[in-house]
Amino acid sequence: MTHSRTALVLIHPATTTRPELLTAAKQHSSLSGANIEQHLVNKLNDGSLQLQDNSYDVIFYVTPEAADEILFPRRLIGVLAAALRAGGSLHGLYDKYQVDALLSGFDIVREPTYHWQKRAVTASAPVKLAPRQPVSAAGLPRFKRASAPSPAAVTPTLDEVPPAAVDPVKAALLDSAAGDAPIAENDLVVGHDSTPITLLTCGRTQTRRRKACKDCTCGLREENEKEISDTHARQEKLLLGDAVKFSEPELAEIDFTIEGKKVGGCGSCSLGDAFRCSGCPYLGLPAFKPGQPINLSAISDDL
């Protein structure tokens, strides 16, 4: 039974500026003698137009765009492939969408005119499998059971050795009661230890002395710490011995609290001045309150 050829013409909206393109497409040899349906491609893109599968023999896309500048929705290529019958052709799209065409089941045909042709679906014939033949016991492979490995020879222990086979001298050494006696730790100390002792050389006196180890237990660390503390004590004693001491006239010169004295030793700053001259002995210190005792020990290091 033969069916009438059906063709679909999809029109780009810009084709209205060049109507001769639509006229030339309808006169194409692939559309001769076919029932032509024409729709705007926008309706197919927005879903308002639904195409039935295997309904068209030819689909023609008309657009004023150049072949390498055509902008066509790629998802519609699969829709057009489903709407074509096996062996049907699609005209108007070019190599820019060649990969999409191959993935959608088209073959690229370049002669006599460029178009895509839908591949025919090859029917797969079922293959009849031969029934599986029962396998007899005689046909099964035979395997030889490996012999169990012989146990390894076990060396008898001293308790299992007969008394006649034991050397009496060795037995006396092994069974000696002295072997179980505790050993004094002093007996384990080597008389001449080959480990050298770390000695430090003083840069001033050129004398050498031992350095205490990290986990010292012989008292050398305590001895070193005591020597260091004694050295610090002597240094502090020497420093304190050179502390500045003021005589009575010197204290009177700088002391603001002396009764009847209103200015300091500089002769210009009074007791309560917050800003002092460059020669004032209390330059940089806050103003003193009247009657407040002045302690000079806090600034003895600076003086």
Curated annotation (Swiss-Prot):
[2Fe-2S] cluster binds at C202, C213, C216, C218. Residues 1-125 are annotated as: N-terminal SAM-like domain. It is found in: Cytoplasm; Mitochondrion intermembrane space. GO terms for cellular component: cytoplasm; cytosolic [4Fe-4S] assembly targeting complex; mitochondrial intermembrane space. The keyword Transferase does not apply. InterPro entries: Anamorsin, CIAPIN1, Dre2_N. Its cofactor is [2Fe-2S] cluster; [4Fe-4S] cluster. A motif (Cx2C motif 1) lies at residues 266-269. GO terms for molecular function: 2 iron, 2 sulfur cluster binding; 4 iron, 4 sulfur cluster binding; electron transfer activity; metal ion binding. Residues 202-218 are annotated as: Fe-S binding site A. It comes from the Eukaryota. Keywords: 2Fe-2S, 4Fe-4S, Cytoplasm, Iron, Iron-sulfur, Metal-binding, Mitochondrion. A motif (Cx2C motif 2) lies at residues 277-280. [4Fe-4S] cluster binds at C266, C269, C277, C280. Residues 266-280 are annotated as: Fe-S binding site B. Residues 126-188 are annotated as: Linker. GO terms for biological process: cellular response to oxidative stress; iron-sulfur cluster assembly; negative regulation of hydrogen peroxide-mediated programmed cell death; negative regulation of nitric oxide biosynthetic process. The keyword Iron-sulfur applies. Monomer. Interacts with TAH18. Interacts with MIA40. Component of the cytosolic iron-sulfur (Fe-S) protein assembly (CIA) machinery required for the maturation of extramitochondrial Fe-S proteins. Part of an electron transfer chain functioning in an early step of cytosolic Fe-S biogenesis, facilitating the de novo assembly of a [4Fe-4S] cluster on the scaffold complex CFD1-NBP35. Electrons are transferred to DRE2 from NADPH via the FAD- and FMN-containing protein TAH18. The C-terminal domain binds 2 Fe-S clusters but is otherwise mostly in an intrinsically disordered conformation. The N-terminal domain has structural similarity with S-adenosyl-L-methionine-dependent methyltransferases, but does not bind S-adenosyl-L-methionine. It is required for correct assembly of the 2 Fe-S clusters. HAMAP family: Anamorsin. Belongs to the anamorsin family. This is Fe-S cluster assembly protein DRE2. It comes from Eremothecium gossypii (strain ATCC 10895 / CBS 109.51 / FGSC 9923 / NRRL Y-1056) (Yeast).
